[in-house]
């Protein structure tokens, strides 16, 4: 049980949490993405490791189709305290959701057949093949060996490990409620159980947006260049994402990619089909945003049925059909289903809010009143 003084701020609390983890676990691994939250968490953990003369792992799953600035940021974190860092930079083959192509539902990262088109080079200093000795576990054969499968197998290969993740409650309340339903370690509610006796901890769970940037500024830490670009463009903080360029929550970044990193955009054009179309329509309300019905369609339900009928990846189609069977049949839900389909969101990273149509509810309310 960790107790805090009433005047303890979030930074002091996070340091106490990380110290507690160091006291109770021999092996600690921090997941990093190049984003601001994992940058702060990695720095806090590395400072504690340096103070104790211990080593911790930094885990980065390289999705290949990423900003060059992301690679630079990850290299920066890996080199901050080299004497205290174990490098778990994975550059292995796996499947990734592809929301920018209407024909290819997945990107096969580090595909040997596409080596001349790889977005950036692999390094001998990184992990280039699956390091685990157990039989590889794949959650869904239809999806193949995917992003989360890599993480699961890595955690299975690291029994009894403390995995630190930069999840913040204010950024993803629904996800945080899901992971904090039951304590993963003793009575620590900001933790969840991981495979093989491991535990995932979220030491920054109560930090807000300004806490993150204050820590970065106070400690003069380098951060991803994309944040400055977005700030100058007036992008809302919630839309500043540095994940893969084909992710269903980051596809709009492609609209500005030619301006931010023109060389990366040129490589992406050659690597993935449909990028040019996605770049032109990323902010189109009729396409990826699914905010307006395209011409020729009279309702969202009719448009959804059309998309299901013409969905190009027949292996992934049953995933959507099974999921949609559990949804209500109204226009509000159907519009969200259309968005999942046009973004190839078979992973359900943009879950449908399965409720009654609020417009119909409002109409019925006023009918009763009047």
Predicted regions and their residues:
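Nucleotide-activated chemistry modules centered on ATP-dependent adenylation/adenylyltransferase
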Residues: 1-31, 36-370
């Amino acid at each position: 049980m960790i107790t805090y003084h009433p005047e303890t701020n979030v930074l002091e609390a996070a340091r106490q949490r990380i110290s507690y983890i160091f006291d109770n676990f021999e092996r600690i691994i921090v997941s990093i993405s190049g984003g601001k939250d994992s940058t702060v968490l990695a720095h806090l953990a590395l400072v504690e490791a340096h103070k104790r003369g211990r080593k911790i792992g930094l885990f980065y799953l390289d999705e290949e189709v990423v900003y060059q600035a992301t690679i630079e940021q990850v290299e920066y974190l890996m080199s901050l305290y080299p004497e205290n860092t174990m490098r778990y930079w994975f550059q292995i083959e796996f499947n990734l959701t592809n929301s920018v192509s209407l024909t290819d539902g997945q990107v096969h990262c580090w595909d040997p057949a596409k080596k001349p088109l790889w977005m950036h080079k692999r390094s001998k200093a990184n992990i280039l093949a699956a390091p685990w000795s157990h039989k590889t576990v794949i959650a869904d054969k239809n999806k193949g060996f995917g992003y989360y499968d890599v993480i699961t197998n890595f955690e299975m290969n690291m029994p009894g490990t403390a995995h630190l993740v930069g999840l913040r409650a204010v950024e993803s309340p629904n996800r945080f409620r899901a992971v904090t339903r039951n304590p993963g370690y003793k009575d620590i509610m900001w933790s969840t159980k991981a495979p093989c006796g491991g535990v995932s901890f979220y030491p920054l769970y109560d930090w807000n947006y300004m806490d993150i940037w204050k820590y970065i500024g106070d400690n003069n830490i380098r951060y991803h260049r994309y944040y400055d670009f977005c700030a100058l463009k007036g992008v809302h903080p919630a839309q500043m994402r540095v994940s893969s360029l084909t992710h269903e929550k980051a596809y709009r970044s492609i609209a500005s990619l030619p301006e931010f990193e023109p060389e990366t955009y040129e490589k992406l054009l050659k690597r993935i089909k449909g990028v040019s179309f996605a770049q032109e329509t990323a902010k189109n309300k009729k396409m990826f945003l699914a905010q307006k019905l395209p011409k020729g369609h009279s309702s969202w339900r009719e448009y959804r049925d059309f998309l299901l009928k013409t969905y190009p990846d027949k292996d992934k189609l049953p995933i959507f059909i099974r999921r949609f069977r559990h949804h209500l049949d109204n226009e509000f839900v159907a519009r969200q289903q259309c968005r999942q389909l046009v973004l190839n969101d078979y992973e359900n990273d943009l879950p449908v809010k399965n409720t009654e149509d609020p417009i119909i509810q409002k109409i019925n309310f006023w009918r009763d009143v009047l």
